[in-house]
Amino acid sequence: VNLIGEHTDYNGGRVFPCALTIGTYGVARRREDKKLRFYSMNFEQLGVIESSVEGLKPEKEADWTNYPKGVMWAFCEKGMEVTNGMDLLLFGNIPNGSGLSSSASVEVLTGYILRDQYGFEVSNQDLALIGQFSENKFNGVNCGIMDQFAIAMGKKDHAIFLDTATMEFEYAPIQLEGAKLVISCSNKKRGLGDSKYNERRSECEAALAELQQVIGIESLGDLSEEQFETYKSAIKDPVRVKRARHAVYENQRTIKA
């Protein structure tokens, strides 16, 4: 869960997430053939879903299995060949569609499994980047790095102050004397793929391109509040002004927090 820093991770800003005590658990067996067999205890009605490591591509009817398949595809794209099939059983206690990164959890878990099965030399940070790459390129969701990073790099009783532009980070102890963090579920299902997420990112990227015509920046996260107010007239659409303003001001709020 992110404590502060919303819509900043894909704008080169800072985020302040922490990992949760709930997650996704899996049992995997490497096969001698090319067959993939997936089963989720959370979606028992779907039964065993079969695929192959050969010619991996997203399939709408496959639903959740696109996440582990995407990570397998991403490993291959990064030069780490997944040569054998797999039987994969998953169980998760993250409320599905609640905005608590269940898909990123599946991605990172799949990365852990592949690293273990094949002996790939990849760090936890690399696994986070591979998970993001798979979600961007295989599943078509232009997410930032925050969810996968928090899951792969989370530390007990700590949050992570992460600069998404440089990937520099530090752990910040969370010791709340006499207080608790409460996460509530509204029961409104949420998925990045069918939300306005990609649209928001496109709007921010368009605003950045307009600002880059008048000031030398790499991302919206490079701007101070004062700089934004000085140069915001370069953004031609009022909606894009709102999107960019949020990214800039939220980034500064995160730094102060």
Short names for language-model regions:
Residues 1-100, 104, 108-124, 129-133, ...:
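ATP-binding N-lobe of GHMP and related small-molecule kinases
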